[in-house]
């Protein structure tokens, strides 16, 4: 290379220098700013460069506790930074209503990495993308569940399963944990598929519980929840650092196998000319009208009812029995109120959902059980698809939005002694809150989600909770044993995506011989 060529090369490099230097400086600046909270976001815990708040994030099973602790320090709406990602935590009713309910068109989406591949699938409604055809079809189909005729069938099916439960509790009172699972599962399967789980020894129960247990273990792994925040990073991690991947494939296979087995039996009954009016028969009859083109999508539609309802309903009734074990004085108050409602029929028939609706104190108990420990302490995350403003904050497009239900329902600024079981708080105010508390947006249905993601099984769940719980108290005196938990501080609940009480002991004694006779009469009818 001669001297002129060298000069030309240096000149060419110098031409790019004015551009390259600012670009390099900008990239360095962006890297250093990664993890820093923008001033327009809600406040939050201090961040570290690049990491943001990543170093402070606990395991999933403890997440609700840390999020609630931060809420007491930074307020009902605050933000976290995970690298470049924004996460907004909602821990008061006003922000949930203002962001997830009122701005639902902008916040109905799920993060694309909410669950790790291969579980994530738009055919599974809880995680389906809001703007997908799958979500639209499922949402339309679930509207068939909330018709007046459907609601009447819920009550009938649940009362039928409650009769079986009462007989099981007479025969095997110590096995109430298993019997409550059968009752919730059979109620849902009957409504969805026209089938019943007749005994607590049915092999489907442990198979389904094993699959859900695997799912909860996977979701409890440290790091798995970052797939919602940094899906591209999770994709490239080796299996040694992403142990949930292998677990996810096994879970997906079991899940779809269960759903297709149930759907196949419905199809066979229809081919044989047997029509039972179940929800899935209605779906198959109207699948073209509803837009179902994929058989797996139909299978998932029914399956989400099993997965979404069995554990949550069983969890509620187990917590109810636990609270009655810890607070036996509540039982007699419920019976006294029920006696007034049923009158002369008190010892001659089982109570119904209609009876439950007339009972003020009993409904306070139901609400307090729901408040003291919700089935899912943290609601599955939402995702903003547009920029939005709330209460002076700017929340940019692409923000993960988390509703901390545990923190909302255990907020000491809202509830007196929030960790104590006090049904009477609902006798004093509609939502059991302290006098003078701002109740903007408060409602009894936070446990079912918010916005356009609210659970379509809300009505069925309310019927189930009241019918099953009231019958248990009508029929049995629940007595603590020496090893029974004494309070919620006794570490009685296993945390996780669905927080089940740990197995505990109590004694269930029939209230009278008349009760035993009534149960046998209706069970043998």
Swiss-Prot record:
It is found in: Membrane. It is an enzyme of class 1 (oxidoreductase). It is a single-pass membrane protein. One of its GO terms (biological process) is terpenoid biosynthetic process. Heme binds at residue 455. It holds the Pfam family p450. GO terms for cellular component: membrane. The chain crosses the membrane at residues 15-32. Its cofactor is heme. Its EC number is 1.-.-.-. One of its GO terms (molecular function) is iron ion binding. Pathway: Secondary metabolite biosynthesis; terpenoid biosynthesis. Keywords: Glycoprotein, Heme, Iron, Membrane, Metal-binding, Monooxygenase, Oxidoreductase, Transmembrane, Transmembrane helix. SUPFAM superfamilies: Cytochrome P450. InterPro entries: Cyt_P450, Cyt_P450_CS, Cyt_P450_E_grp-I, Cyt_P450_sf, Cytochrome_P450_fung. Glycans are attached at residues 2, 148. Belongs to the cytochrome P450 family. PANTHER family: CYTOCHROME P450 MONOOXYGENASE ALNH-RELATED (PTHR46300:SF2), P450, PUTATIVE (EUROFUNG)-RELATED-RELATED (PTHR46300). Cytochrome P450 monooxygenase; part of the gene cluster that mediates the biosynthesis of pleuromutilin, a tricyclic diterpene showing antibacterial properties. The geranylgeranyl diphosphate (GGPP) synthase ple4 catalyzes the first step in pleuromutilin biosynthesis. GGPP is then substrate of the premutilin synthase (PS) ple3 to yield premutilin. Premutilin synthase is a bifunctional enzyme composed of the fusion of a class II diterpene cyclase (DTC) and a class I diterpene synthase (DTS), with the corresponding domains and active sites containing characteristic aspartate-rich motifs. This is Cytochrome P450 monooxygenase ple6. The lineage of its organism: Eukaryota, Fungi, Dikarya, Basidiomycota, Agaricomycotina. The gene is ple6.
């Amino acid at each position: 290379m001669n001297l002129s060529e060298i000069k030309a090369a240096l000149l060419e490099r110098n031409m790019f220098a004015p551009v390259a230097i600012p670009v390099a400086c900008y990239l360095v600046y962006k890297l250093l700013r990664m993890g820093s909270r923008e001033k327009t976001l809600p406040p939050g815990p201090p961040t570290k460069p690049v990491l943001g708040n990543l170093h402070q994030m606990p395991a999933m099973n403890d997440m609700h506790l840390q999020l609630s602790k931060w809420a007491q320090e930074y307020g009902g709406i605050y933000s976290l930074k995970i690298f470049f990602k924004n996460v907004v935590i909602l821990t008061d009713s006003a922000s949930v209503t203002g962001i997830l309910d009122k701005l639902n068109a902008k916040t109905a989406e799920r993060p694309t990495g909410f669950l790790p591949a291969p579980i994530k699938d738009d055919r599974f409604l809880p995680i389906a993308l809001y703007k997908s055809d799958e979500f639209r079809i499922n949402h339309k189909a679930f509207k068939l569940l909330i018709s007046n005729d459907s609601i009447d069938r819920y009550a009938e099916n649940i009362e039928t399963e409650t009769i079986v439960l009462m007989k099981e509790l007479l025969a095997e009172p110590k096995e109430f944990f298993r019997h409550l699972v059968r009752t919730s599962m059979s109620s849902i399967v009957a409504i969805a598929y026209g089938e019943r789980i007749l005994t607590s020894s049915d092999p489907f129960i442990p198979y389904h519980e094993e699959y859900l247990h695997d799912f909860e273990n996977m979701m409890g792994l440290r790091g798995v929840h970052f797939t919602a925040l940094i899906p591209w990073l999770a994709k490239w991690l080796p299996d040694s650092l992403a142990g949930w991947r292998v677990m996810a494939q096994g879970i997906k296979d079991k899940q779809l196998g269960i759903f297709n087995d149930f759907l196949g039996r419905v199809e066979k009954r229809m081919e044989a000319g047997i029509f039972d009016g179940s929800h899935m028969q209605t779906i198959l009859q109207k699948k073209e009208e509803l837009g179902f083109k994929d058989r797996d999508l139909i299978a998932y539609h029914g399956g989400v009812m099993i997965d979404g309802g069995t554990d949550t309903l069983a969890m509620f009734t187990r917590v109810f029995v636990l609270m009655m074990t810890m607070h036996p004085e509540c039982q007699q108050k419920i019976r006294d109120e029920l006696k007034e409602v049923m009158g002369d029929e008190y010892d001659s028939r089982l109570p119904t959902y209609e009876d439950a609706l007339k009972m003020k104190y009993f409904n306070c108990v139901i609400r307090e059980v729901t408040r003291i420990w919700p089935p899912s302490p943290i609601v599955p995350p939402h995702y903003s698809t547009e920029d939005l403003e709330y209460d002076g904050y700017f929340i940019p497009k692409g923000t993960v939005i988390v509703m901390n239900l545990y923190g909302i329902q255990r907020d000491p600024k809202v509830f007196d002694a929030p960790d104590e079981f006090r049904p009477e708080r609902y006798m004093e105010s509609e939502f059991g809150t302290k006098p003078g508390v701002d109740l903007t947006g408060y409602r009894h249905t936070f446990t079912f989600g918010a916005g356009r993601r609210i659970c379509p099984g809300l009505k069925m769940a309310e019927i189930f909770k009241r019918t099953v719980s009231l019958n248990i108290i009508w029929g049995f005196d629940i007595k603590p044993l020496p090893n029974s938990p004494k309070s919620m501080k006794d570490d009685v609940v296993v945390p996780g995506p669905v927080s089940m009480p740990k197995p505990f002991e109590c004694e269930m004694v029939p209230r009278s011989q008349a009760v035993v006779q009534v149960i046998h009469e209706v069970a043998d009818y």
